[in-house]
């Protein structure tokens, strides 16, 4: 595994570019603390059995209204107004394109009802489509699969999909299609305390996410073993690895730091024990890091 992780500095720089909002060259050195290589055994596999939506159990947490005071609301409104003003100024600065430069109006193909809001706010919707025409759509907190004609092939809750007895609810799902490996990857979370936080990573066994089955990994969300829980995951793949970023919070829901997990996706596709490292204490203490997958030299 040493060779797998020796070029991490390149990936970390790519992962952190989104926080710079600049395309100028920089000599800034970005550093991070690297954990030991961790081996996570596969928690099992799941063979999909759909659930009739009329009987699909949905568990929603009681909402907490924010902000809690008029002063807080005034501050939020002022920030929104300032952002809207900056956005409009940016739009006004963009020159109007010449008529010949305008692109042709896209033609709508198949149109069908998608994965509806299950009552969570925010919706946290994510969708991926394969070269073979399979569509995997996730929201808080359900999953649906279709073909490109709009035929529903599978419906379930996220907890029902991962099929782990200790997981009764899941949230913050993200799904992507890995066009190099012709597989799907789905990541979701469970638990909002250091002792209950779980990071669930699922790999489709074949190119068919409906009938081919999935490998499921149940990772401790307290990734640094310092009594923090994992939130706001974002994902990306390279030729050999899966990157998952997330924000760590204390038991009092106070932000601690953002971290990056680097996992061996090839092992995940085979259901083997999966190697991973965690990167923390990143230069500049960025928050809400968005991983960037590099180009694969092929297209959808």
Where are these regions (language model features)?
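C-terminal PAP-associated
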Residues: 25-300
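Bacterial Sec-dependent N-terminal signal peptides
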Residues: 1-28
């Amino acid at each position: 595994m040493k060779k797998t992780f020796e070029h991490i500095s390149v990936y970390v720089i790519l992962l952190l570019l989104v926080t710079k909002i600049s395309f100028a060259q920089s000599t800034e050195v970005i550093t991070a603390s690297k954990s030991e290589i961790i081996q996570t055994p596969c928690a099992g596999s799941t063979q999909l059995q759909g659930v009739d939506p009329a009987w699909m159990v949905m568990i929603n947490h009681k909402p907490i209204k924010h902000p809690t005071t008029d002063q807080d609301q005034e501050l939020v409104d002022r920030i929104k107004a300032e952002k809207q003003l900056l956005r409009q100024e940016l739009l006004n600065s963009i020159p109007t394109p010449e008529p010949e430069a305008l692109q042709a109006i896209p033609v709508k193909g198949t149109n069908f009802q998608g994965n509806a809001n299950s009552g969570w706010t925010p919706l946290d919707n994510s969708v991926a489509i394969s070269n073979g025409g399979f569509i995997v759509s996730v929201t808080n907190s359900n999953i649906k699969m279709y073909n490109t004609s709009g035929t529903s092939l599978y419906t379930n809750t996220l907890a029902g999909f991962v099929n782990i007895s200790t997981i009764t609810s899941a949230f913050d799902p993200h799904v992507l299609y890995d066009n190099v490996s012709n597989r799907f990857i789905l990541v979701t979370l469970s638990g909002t305390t250091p002792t209950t936080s779980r990071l669930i990573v699922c790999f489709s066994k074949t190119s068919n996410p409906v009938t081919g089955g999935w490998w499921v990994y149940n990772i401790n969300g307290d990734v640094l073993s310092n009594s923090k829980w994992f939130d706001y995951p974002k994902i990306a793949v390279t030729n050999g690895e899966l990157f998952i970023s997330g924000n760590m919070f204390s038991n009092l829901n106070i932000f601690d730091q953002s971290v990056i997990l680097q996992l061996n996706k090839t092992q995940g596709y085979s259901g083997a024990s999966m190697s991973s490292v965690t990167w923390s204490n990143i230069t500049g203490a960025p928050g809400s890091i968005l991983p960037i997958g590099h180009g694969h030299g092929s297209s959808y």
